């Protein structure tokens, strides 16, 4: 089963589900859809005898702060074991409205994956049976994997080259 066959099957049964597609450098088909159609599309991919993507390898959230109105996203990595085919299904949405329907009704293993993405990115999986932080403290008010925070403390001086007898080099400046 190749990308064209997968897309033909989806388009035949859900003509408006696919917003765009691309084949990544690793050869895996990426399908972009909407939040409103994600569960129906995932159900089709899992339950259709021709498609048979019965295994949710993982799901992860991503944050692109430069994409206004689509800053956050969730990517579902699916695998058809019988045909050894993998695909990714992606959805994007505003960070101010970070709600996505849960996939735990389709794959119970999505439970902990969704909890992790809630914990690190703040994506709320609507209908999740136990959506709470999984690794961070319950009273943490931020989502640490979002690209909204400095990577290092700007007041640190222990990594300043001037303290090691180096003046810096071309293309590098010191504040």
PLM features: what roles do these ranges have?
Residues 1-175:
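Terminal low-complexity/charged segments
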